[in-house]
Amino acid sequence: MTTLFLLIALFITTILNPTSGESVGVCYGMMGNNLPSQSDTIALFRQNNIRRVRLYDPNQAALNALRNTGIEVIIGVPNTDLRSLTNPSSARSWLQNNVLNYYPAVSFKYIAVGNEVSPSNGGDVVLPAMRNVYDALRGANLQDRIKVSTAIDMTLIGNSFPPSSGEFRGDVRWYIDPVIGFLTSTNSALLANIYPYFSYVDNPRDISLSYALFTSPSVVVWDGSRGYQNLFDALLDVVYSAVERSGGGSLPVVVSESGWPSNGGNAASFDNARAFYTNLASRVRENRGTPKRPGRGVETYLFAMFDENQKSPEIEKNFGLFFPNKQPKFPITFSAARDGTAVE
C-alpha cells in the first residue's frame, strides 16, 4: 500500500511539475546595428529561462556575460578561421583563448567547427580542423565534457523522399562520410540546420503549409508503417537515414538551427512564424522523438534571438523571436521544467 501511495504521489508530482523534456535552445546572432548589448541579451535569456545558446563566433562580451549562468553553449569557429586551425598550434591557441579561458564558468557543450561549409569551398579543411580542436581538448582532458562537431545544411542531401531513403549526395560523400566517422569515434553528434520553411517555399505544390507548420490534423505522409504529420520530423528522419547510410549508425543529430521568418518572403508572416516556433518548441519539450527514433529527445535551437537588420537577403532579417527592443514577438515556453516561464 505504501508503494502504491508513493507511485500516486510521484505521478501527481510529475503532472503538476513536469521536469522531463528537452529545453529549447536559441541561436544568438549579432548582425544588427540596433541590438541590445551582450550582457542585456544574456539577461534576457535568463529572464525567459532559455537554457541553451548557440554562438556563431567566440564573442568575448557574450562569453563573459555567460559566466556562471549555467546556460549550455555551442560555440562556433567561423568558417574564415578553419584553415588556420589545420595547424595544431593554432588550434591549441584558439581553444585556450576562446574556451579554456572561460571554462568551467561558461558551460560549453559543443564546438561547432564551421557552419554550412560547402564541400567544394573549404570542405577539405573542416575535418583536419575538427581533429586538431579535438586533440587540443584531449590535451586539456576535456574531450568527454566538450564535444567537437560541425553544422551542415540540407543541401548536402541527395535523396529525401521517403524519409527512410534519405541519403547524402554522391558528390559530397568524400566530405561527409569521414566527418561522420570522426563524430562516431568521438561520441559526438552531428549538427544539422533544418528549415521546413525553405522546403515548403521551394515546393508549395507538393508540400502543404499545414504540414510545414505542425498544424495538419492527420498523417500526411506514410513511409511504410511510419506516419508523418509534420515536415520537421520527416526532414530530421531524412538526416538520420542519411547518417546511417554513411556509416554513422545511431549517431545523435542536434538541430542546430530551425526557424520561420515573420516577413520578407513567400509565406513569411507573423502568424506563420508564431505557429511554427510555438509548435516546434512544444514538440521539443515533449521529448516525443520522430517516427524513426521515437522517444528520443531532439536537442533543438530556434533561429534566432533577434531580427538582424544587417543580414541579407531581406528574408534573413526577419527570423527573430524578439524585437531589438527586447520585446517578444509571440509567447514561447522554452523549458518544460517547473520553473519554466513563457514569454508573454
Swiss-Prot record:
The active site is at residues 116, 257. Residues 1-21 form the signal peptide. It is an enzyme of class 3 (hydrolase). Gene3D superfamilies: Glycosidases. PROSITE patterns: GLYCOSYL_HYDROL_F17. It is found in: Secreted. Keywords: Glycosidase, Hydrolase, Plant defense, Secreted, Signal. GO terms for molecular function: glucan endo-1,3-beta-D-glucosidase activity. GO terms for cellular component: extracellular region; plant-type vacuole; secretory vesicle. It catalyses: Hydrolysis of (1->3)-beta-D-glucosidic linkages in (1->3)-beta-D-glucans. Its EC number is 3.2.1.39. One of its GO terms (biological process) is defense response to fungus. The keyword Signal applies. Induction: Induced by infection with the Cucumber mosaic virus (CMV). InterPro entries: Glyco_hydro_17, Glyco_hydro_17_plant, Glycoside_hydrolase_SF. May be involved in plant defense against cyst nematode pathogens. Belongs to the glycosyl hydrolase 17 family. (Microbial infection) Interacts with the 30C02 effector protein (AC G3GD54) of the beet cyst nematode Heterodera schachtii. Interaction with the 30C02 effector protein may potentially suppress beta-1,3-glucanase activity and plant defense. This is Probable glucan endo-1,3-beta-glucosidase At4g16260. It comes from Arabidopsis thaliana (Mouse-ear cress). The lineage of its organism: Eukaryota, Viridiplantae, Streptophyta, Embryophyta, Tracheophyta.
